[in-house]
Amino acid sequence: EVAQVIEQIDPYEFNVTEALKGLDGGKFFISRAEEITFTTHLVTQSEQLKDFSRHKVFSSICRDLIGPDVRLYWDQAVYKKPGTKDEFPWHQDNGYTFIEPQAYLTCWIALTDTDETNGCPWVMPGLHQKGTLFHEPTDLGHEIPLDSSESICLPLKAGSIAIFSSLTPHRTGPNLSDGIRKSYILQYAPDGAKRVIS
């Protein structure tokens, strides 16, 4: 199933990369053609990915953690290119898209094996209880200034899922490998949740 998901995503990610290459500096907001790309709204372009987002695994997770009335809030593929030296900084997903009620659910799906060498996720446990934290704007995106000493590394095999609240601070490290680190992120919110525009 992972191979089929990659097969669906790759052409769209290629188009995003090519579009970024045509822009000044090869970047737009936090996407960088040669470093990290964000390919969004894939379920609106691929019936297979729409079906994947409705897989019984996600339905079961959402029912257990959110309740029976859930909708897909956001989806994106994040490809971290080989040799990317920068980490993607500490942030909460709510720091990018704030909704009420605050917490929604992030399913971070590894499409390739990922560990400390190629940009696996790290999380900071417990801080989700403090709500949405202050984020500073940086060249690499919104960042929460945090001491990383208590953080937990989440190495994942392809097909594995890291599940956390949109209020959980997390980051990904650099990709020092010679392969693309591929992930697909599905986020689910309670039905009726509203996006708050600040």
Task: List where the protein language model places each region.
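Short, P/G- and charge-enriched loop/turn segments at secondary-structure junctions
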Residues: 93-96, 149-151
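Double-stranded beta-helix
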Residues: 114-173, 193
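Short, conserved beta-strand element in jelly-roll/cupin
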Residues: 65, 91, 98-116, 155-156, ...
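A generic structural micro-feature
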Residues: 86, 99-103, 178-180
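Non-heme Fe(II)-dependent double-stranded beta-helix
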Residues: 1-90, 96
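Glycine-rich phosphate/pyrophosphate-binding beta-alpha loops
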Residues: 93-95, 104, 171-175
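Short acidic/polar capping segments at secondary-structure boundaries
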Residues: 77-84, 94-95, 102-103, 111-116, ...
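Non-heme Fe(II)/2-oxoglutarate
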Residues: 10-17, 24-25, 134-138, 161, ...
